[in-house]
């Protein structure tokens, strides 16, 4: 397929640049992957779409204030976007300045903290923080929330709360797992009251999620790599859901990619490592039966993923309908509930055979 097959026209006014006052006040477009039928709902209607015994799998990554501003010792301005923390003192980052930093060069941050460049790794720069505290503490003090470029605004104090899920726990993402932004205590309580089970994965969303696809054929795209962890207790929760006839419902594409990365030929196992899994039409899902997701950018890898899940024609038709109905798009926008166009290969497996492993998997090879 061509990347252009995933284009759709989106009026600028439908891009949500700020969140609604209440997290769960968003709209919810339900799409049946088998029939293609759509239903227009509110996000607070989500419990009505689920059955007791279903399992919701959330991504509990926490967005770090990853954008920094500083200057070189020569006085030139520099902007830094942390891509990945490497322990307490070291990091990989993107930089923006008139000239790229050189090995050994120091960058001075807003409060006098300093980074020294150790090496360049492709498009990223490897830095070490020269202070005594953990660099994450520096980010919390002077960093800015890394809002997506399409918001076309500077971050505000309120983004520290709203560009973060209420269940965020593991620090490391530079973009929010946005499907989770709709959940508040009211919705979570209603889900628990209905007998819906919860489980968690961690995928630290990288800045690569905002990079455009620069090839014509989707098969030629090389996916960026991100750190993911599917713990043994989540594998157990999935197996128990299967045993009682419940569905595995992934909250967001990051949860989908985590679970599918941890599935080997239909076998879900504990997973910890890097994943560059790229899911597009033709991929056979191993574990996920339904998903909650936001509306994604035209020609992005994420609209390719949801097309693989609920059907290309179904998704493109639903997106056109969402535009007509003036749904709000992207990170701070509205949500979709998708069921699969065909059953996953999920099956009941015991956790005694689960073992940690690292893979770098591509969707087309599964």
UniProtKB/Swiss-Prot annotation:
One of its GO terms (molecular function) is S-adenosylmethionine:tRNA ribosyltransferase-isomerase activity. Keywords: Cytoplasm, Queuosine biosynthesis, S-adenosyl-L-methionine, Transferase. It comes from the Bacteria. The gene is queA. The lineage of its organism: Bacteria, Pseudomonadati, Pseudomonadota, Gammaproteobacteria, Pseudomonadales. It catalyses: 7-aminomethyl-7-carbaguanosine(34) in tRNA + S-adenosyl-L-methionine = epoxyqueuosine(34) in tRNA + adenine + L-methionine + 2 H(+). It comes from Marinobacter nauticus (strain ATCC 700491 / DSM 11845 / VT8) (Marinobacter aquaeolei). Belongs to the QueA family. Residues 354-366 have a biased composition (Basic and acidic residues). Monomer. It holds the Pfam family Queuosine_synth. Its main location: cytoplasm. This is S-adenosylmethionine:tRNA ribosyltransferase-isomerase. Transfers and isomerizes the ribose moiety from AdoMet to the 7-aminomethyl group of 7-deazaguanine (preQ1-tRNA) to give epoxyqueuosine (oQ-tRNA). GO terms for biological process: queuosine biosynthetic process; tRNA wobble guanine modification. One of its GO terms (cellular component) is cytoplasm.
């Amino acid at each position: 397929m061509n990347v252009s097959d995933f284009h759709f026209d989106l009026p600028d006014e439908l891009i949500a640049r700020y969140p609604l006052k209440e997290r769960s006040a968003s709209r919810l477009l339900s799409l049946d992957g088998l029939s293609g039928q759509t239903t227009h709902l509110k996000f607070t209607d989500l419990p009505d779409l689920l059955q007791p015994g279903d399992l919701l799998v959330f991504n509990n990554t926490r967005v770090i204030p990853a954008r920094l501003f500083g200057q070189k010792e020569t006085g030139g301005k520099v902007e830094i976007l942390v891509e990945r923390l490497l322990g307490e003192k070291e990091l990989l980052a993107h930089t923006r300045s008139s000239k790229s930093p050189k090995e050994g060069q120091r960058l001075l941050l807003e409060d006098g903290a300093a980074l020294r460049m150790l090496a360049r790794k492709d498009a990223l720069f490897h830095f070490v923080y020269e202070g005594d505290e953990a660099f994450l503490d520096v980010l919390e003090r002077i960093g800015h929330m890394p809002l997506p470029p399409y918001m076309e605004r500077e971050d505000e104090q309120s983004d520290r709360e709203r560009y973060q899920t209420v269940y965020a726990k593991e620090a490391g993402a530079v973009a929010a797992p946005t499907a989770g932004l709709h959940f508040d205590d009211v919705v979570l309580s209603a889900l628990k009251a209905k007998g819906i089970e919860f489980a968690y994965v961690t995928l630290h969303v990288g800045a690569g999620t905002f990079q455009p696809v620069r090839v014509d054929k989707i098969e030629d795209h090389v996916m960026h790599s991100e750190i993911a962890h599917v713990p043994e207790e989540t594998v157990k929760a999935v197996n128990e859901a299967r045993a009682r006839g419940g569905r595995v419902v992934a909250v967001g594409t990051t949860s989908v990619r985590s679970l599918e990365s941890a599935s080997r030929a239909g076998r879900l196992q504990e997973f910890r490592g890097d994943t560059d899994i790229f899911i597009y039409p033709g991929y056979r899902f191993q574990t996920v039966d339904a998903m909650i997701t936001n509306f994604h950018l035209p020609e992005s890898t994420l609209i390719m993923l949801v097309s693989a899940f609920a059907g290309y024609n179904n998704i493109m038709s639903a997106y056109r309908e969402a535009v007509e109905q003036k749904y709000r798009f992207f990170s701070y926008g509205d949500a979709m509930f998708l069921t699969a166009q065909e059953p996953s290969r999920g099956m009941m497996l015991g956790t005694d055979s689960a073992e940690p492993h690292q893979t770098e998997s591509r969707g087309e090879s599964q």
